[in-house]
């Protein structure tokens, strides 16, 4: 477990890695995607300017770099589980965005993203998500519920984010609003 000072230092470090990764990789990605004519009209602007896509690889590379650094610093198996879950969810989303897939594909494929969380927790005896849920009103100890709940939460969360991302930036703004109370409850 990290103490408060290291938590802040590591949090600032991984945030900086993610931020600067996106900041520096995005211009190169824009040039590359534009040169390859991988652009689509921006449906949310009146003049419909061409926008390069996909931006997901830049975001994933930046998140993965930050998570790898955090794992190396802490050697916390939960970070590795989060990295693998994020990578699998990214691959599923990338496939879903680049090809026309049937409606059932994404929710079913996102079940694979839950596997690292469950398998690494079983292999490392409670180091990934622990023995109890830390809730605002106290702790709940229901270990048999955690595994099936993870297999429900990952596909539901993935599809929810996909469905609320109707305008540029809506998903990121919504996630910031949703994460603030979550972080507060974890800190308490």
Where are these regions (language model features)?
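"…together with the soluble PPM/PP2C metallo-phosphatase catalytic core" -> "…together
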Residues: 2-188
